[in-house]
């Protein structure tokens, strides 16, 4: 089965995690010695999804340097000091990813970033997520659910604190209404693991468009947004407190999102 490419939004300022993001972009903030973005990508790669299209913005140079250096840092290396010749030696378990790093501007909104990735994603189904959310979602089951209903968009939903946007979901998993801010704290919320068809780009006006507002609201109103309910682990690393909690889970050796070997 051909796997869809994975679009990842990684260009935001990360202001709620300023203790870390003053020095580095949020995607490179580390959990267990690896960037949070690495954890997100390992999750997708565990399901055979190895083609990544990453939207850059804030501190894009640091992001590019990280991926340029990644092969060298993952390899054993021989350096010949006489002439500076370098030879890399593969090690077992080395990453096998194709990563496209796309500059989507320093202040482009989430919808605008997605639209700027359109020409790099092709004319087929694609996955979409953010750089700071980790989960144990079965991505093949999510993809199968999306393909079963024939709509333009699938959003993964979870139960979580009331600071997240609320969705009114029908018995058939159709999203009847999408609200950026919740009206109460017991609804299903946007976990930002999407499966999308190219038709969603028509719902995005331009750089000032926030994906979580008009595009998702319009998709829901048109009956083109379906919800995949996830009842297991999901966390978003928005604050220093949440980073510390994820570090503790990783250090315990029982991180629920570590589904890879």
Residue ranges and their predicted role:
Residues 62-170:
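Conserved beta-loop-beta/alpha segment of the NTase-like Rossmann-fold superfamily
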Residues 122-129, 134, 138-147, 159-162, ...:
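Catalytic-core segments of class I nucleotidyltransferases/pyrophosphorylases
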Residues 28, 166-169, 216, 227:
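A structural signal for short hydrophobic beta-strand segments in well-ordered beta-sheet cores
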Residues 12, 166-175:
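Acidic-glycine-rich active-site phosphate/pyrophosphate-binding loop
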Residues 2-72, 101:
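N-terminal glycine-rich phosphate-binding loop and ensuing alpha1 helix
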Residues 36-39, 112-116, 215:
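Well-ordered alpha-helical segments embedded in enzymatic catalytic cores
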């Amino acid at each position: 089965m051909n796997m869809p490419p994975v679009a990842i939004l990684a260009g935001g300022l990360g202001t709620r995690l300023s203790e870390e993001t003053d020095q580095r972009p949020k995607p490179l903030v580390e959990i267990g010695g690896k960037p949070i973005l690495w954890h997100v990508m390992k999750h997708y790669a565990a399901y055979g999804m190895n083609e990544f299209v990453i939207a850059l913005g804030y501190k894009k140079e640091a992001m590019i340097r990280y991926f340029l250096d990644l092969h060298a840092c993952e390899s054993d290396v021989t350096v010949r000091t006489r002439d500076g010749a370098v030879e890399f030696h593969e090690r077992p378990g080395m990453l096998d990813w194709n990563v496209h790093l796309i500059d989507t501007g320093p202040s482009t909104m989430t919808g605008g970033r997605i639209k700027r990735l359109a020409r790099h994603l092709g004319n087929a189904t694609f996955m979409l997520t953010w750089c700071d959310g980790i989960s144990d979602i079965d991505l093949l089951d999510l993809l199968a659910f999306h393909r079963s209903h024939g709509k333009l968009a699938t959003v993964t939903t979870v139960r979580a604190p009331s600071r997240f946007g609320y969705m009114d979901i029908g018995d058939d998993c159709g999203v009847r209404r999408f609200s950026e801010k919740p009206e109460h704290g017991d609804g299903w919320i946007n976990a930002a693991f999407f499966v999308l068809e190219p038709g969603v780009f028509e719902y995005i006006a331009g750089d000032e468009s926030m994906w979580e507002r008009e595009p998702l609201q319009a998709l829901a109103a048109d009956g083109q947004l379906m919800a995949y309910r996830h009842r297991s682990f999901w966390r978003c690393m928005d604050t220093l407190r949440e980073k510390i909690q994820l570090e503790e889970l990783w250090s315990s050796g029982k991180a629920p999102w570590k589904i890879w070997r």
